[in-house]
Amino acid sequence: MLEQMGKAAKQASWQLAVLSTAKKNQVLSVIADKLEAESEVILQANEQDMEQARASGMSEALLDRLLLTPARLAAIANDVRQVCRLNDPVGHVLDGSLLDSGLKLERRRVPLGVIGVIYEARPNVTIDVASLCLKTGNAVILRGGKETHHTNQATVKVIQQALEQCGLPAAAVQAIESPDRALVNELLRLDRYVDMLIPRGGAGLHKLCREQSTIPVITGGIGVCHTYVDDSVDFDKALTVIENAKIQRPSACNSLETLLVNRNIAAEFLPALSSKMAVVGVTLHAAENAMPMLQDGPATVVAVAAEDYDDEWLSLDLNVALVDDIDQAIDHIRTHGTSHSDAILTRSLSSAEHFVRAVDSSAVYVNASTRFTDGGQFGLGAEVAVSTQKLHARGPMGLDALTTYKWIGYGDDLVRS
């Protein structure tokens, strides 16, 4: 089955690679229109998935990721239209030169070919990934989790109808519908057809892909994100940033999970933090050194467990620990971080610069919320993933990350001497 899908995707990718930008934008516009026209069907399919997820005891954090609402679906359709407005990187000449031999050489962006994406309870990923792949002339094979089975079926059907309406093969966007996990292992070895694999899920999925795939893998998306509060901060401004990073969307991979506070301000800052978090319903998981200043505050507080520092809460929970200085904060991030998004709140330029240089994450912020790590916020349009590795993409992966380049040489019946 996957052999046939891979072959069809590869053949479709050859057609996509030579499409004009106007034609690709036409396809995306039709997809956006059809998402709105078929919204009732898609939302009904999503409700089937939600009912099954609730019955299985899925956590509130994951239920929120799975849920599609009319507003969320409309936003997804608008994201597709935003991709239409983005510059098409395909065909862009990165650099060029005229060599002594007379050969005119240029390096030009081209599609990767066929992308494989494995993801879990995130129905928006189907549309986000498909739109970015189509804009860059790539075919895609999607393998969503069983939690999103009905939603993915409905959305992929809409995309394939749009492709055929525009005279393009439906095989440009395909989904593996069977929940059989053996098919994941088969996909990981489909290197004859698939050029890059992107897993979007938990640590177990990432480990499986790294160990078993014969296809280049881009991993990321696991976000144990930190914010360090320096002793020079304005309390009110710092608390506003912390609140945004934690509660705007707790289930997102760029939400704040661990707060590191400079010991010099702890006696004043932690009670203020407790008051702020109590209002928004955040439970504080306090380190032993922070507990005395939090236990009598209005926020719910429990003792942090050692393993809490290494896991995503994805909920209204926040680890809080005191550090002696910026270097101890950096050491903590190096030990427990996932190279996703980390921030410093400070009024010291030297501290800010030291933090930026020393913290080796895909996104590092000074006096800003970690919630900004997002393709839309970065001006990249919808993102295919957030890469926490260094090759070949890092951070939110927009259009450029779905391309490679080829060398093109022009001569006048030129031969090498």
Curated annotation (Swiss-Prot):
Protein name: Gamma-glutamyl phosphate reductase
Keywords: Amino-acid biosynthesis, Cytoplasm, NADP, Oxidoreductase, Proline biosynthesis
GO cellular component terms, A-Z: cytoplasm
Record function comment: Catalyzes the NADPH-dependent reduction of L-glutamate 5-phosphate into L-glutamate 5-semialdehyde and phosphate. The product spontaneously undergoes cyclization to form 1-pyrroline-5-carboxylate.
Keyword Oxidoreductase listed: yes
UniProt-listed InterPro entries: Ald_DH/histidinol_DH, Ald_DH_C, Ald_DH_N, Aldehyde_DH_dom, G-glutamylP_reductase_CS, Glu-5-SA_DH, GPR_dom
Top-level lineage group: Bacteria
An example Gene Ontology biological process: L-proline biosynthetic process
Catalytic function, reaction form: L-glutamate 5-semialdehyde + phosphate + NADP(+) = L-glutamyl 5-phosphate + NADPH + H(+)
Family according to the record: Belongs to the gamma-glutamyl phosphate reductase family.
GO MF annotation terms: glutamate-5-semialdehyde dehydrogenase activity; NADP binding
Cell location: Cytoplasm
EC number per UniProt: 1.2.1.41
Keyword Oxidoreductase applies: yes
Pathway: Amino-acid biosynthesis; L-proline biosynthesis; L-glutamate 5-semialdehyde from L-glutamate: step 2/2
Top EC category: oxidoreductase
Cross-referenced NCBIfam families: PRK00197.1, proA
